[in-house]
């Protein structure tokens, strides 16, 4: 998937909900009911950060809930991309945008919401073809 197509797919995902909850879930047992509650409340797009040991299991459980679109957040290495796909993630979110992560997502046909914090990073991603980006961290630098 080229950057243009990745951005088109990511844009479609982003348009499904007014906000995308960023979830840090420590217990996989609550994953399915949490996803069901969020989806029934009008938030079908869920980002599960890869910051806990249970994150991949959480993605796997949430991906089973009808009507949900589950992404893996805090992607920092190419192996994270592969693990996220194996867990059932529909998209990836990265806090930064290394060539390795972008190339792996492209090779694996996984839409990515690449992170950028500076104007240089944003311009570089635009030059590569990524028109949909995550401003991260969303605070004063």
Positions of the model-derived regions?
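Conserved N-terminal beta1-alpha1 strand-loop-helix module at the mouth
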Residues: 1-91, 107
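Conserved anion-binding
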Residues: 54, 79, 85-141
């Amino acid at each position: 998937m080229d950057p243009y197509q990745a951005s088109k797919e990511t844009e479609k995902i982003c348009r499904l909900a007014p906000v995308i909850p960023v979830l840090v879930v420590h217990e996989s047992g609550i994953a399915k009911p949490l996803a069901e509650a969020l989806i029934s409340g009008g938030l079908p797009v869920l980002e599960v950060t890869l910051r806990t040991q249970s994150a991949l299991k959480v993605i796997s459980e949430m991906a089973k809930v009808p009507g949900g679109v589950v992404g893996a957040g805090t992607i920092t290495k190419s192996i994270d991309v592969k693990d996220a796909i194996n867990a059932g993630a529909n998209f990836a979110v990265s806090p930064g945008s290394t060539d390795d992560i972008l190339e792996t997502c492209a090779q694996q046909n996984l839409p990515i919401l690449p992170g950028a914090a500076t104007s240089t990073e944003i311009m570089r991603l635009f030059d590569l073809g990524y028109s949909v980006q995550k401003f991260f961290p969303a605070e004063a630098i």
